[in-house]
């Protein structure tokens, strides 16, 4: 089976042929993504202050609160994460042969997040401490690359 056929199978099924480690680690990843998605979507601050430790921005009396706009976008990001997560859960339930494609999406998404942080950098005064996402991006990218490679391997029989 070619690399293209493994990444984009002609038919989705539960017949996963890759290394089981990639499957188990993906289950751990979606557990982490579940927490992250619900936190961003449901928390009053979208996790912006409580987890990412971005400061609460001051505003003048009678002026609109800029924090509400930030919280809105955090919640919108959370909704997008939950939609992605639903696809991940469906694939783990019914279409496990799409696991290499799912790992590829993680391999693409993490550098895009890192690029967004580079294009719109926030310096130290914006944070109370280094946010978890900033610390975890590189390790997550490395793990995702390894898991993508493992998911493309054929199972040993």
Predicted regions and their residues:
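Juxtamembrane helix-break-helix junctions at the cytosolic face
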Residues: 85-100
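Short, Lys/Arg-rich, polar N-terminal cytosolic tail immediately upstream
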Residues: 1-15
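Juxtamembrane "helix-exit" motif on the non-cytosolic side of transmembrane helices
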Residues: 115-125
């Amino acid at each position: 089976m070619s690399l293209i056929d493994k990444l984009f199978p002609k038919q989705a099924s539960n017949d996963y042929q890759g290394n089981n480690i990639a499957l188990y680690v993906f289950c751990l990843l979606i557990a982490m993504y579940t927490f992250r998605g619900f936190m961003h979507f449901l928390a009053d601050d979208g996790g912006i202050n409580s987890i990412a430790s971005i400061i609460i921005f001051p505003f003048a009396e009678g002026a609109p609160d800029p924090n509400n706009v930030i919280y809105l976008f955090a919640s919108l990001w959370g909704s997008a994460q939950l939609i992605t997560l639903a696809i991940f859960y469906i694939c783990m339930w019914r279409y496990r042969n799409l696991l290499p494609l799912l790992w590829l999406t993680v391999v693409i998404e993490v550098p895009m997040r890192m690029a967004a942080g580079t294009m719109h950098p926030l310096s130290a005064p914006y944070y109370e401490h280094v946010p978890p996402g900033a610390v975890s991006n590189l390790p997550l990218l490395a793990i995702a690359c390894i898991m993508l490679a493992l998911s493309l391997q054929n199972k040993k029989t």
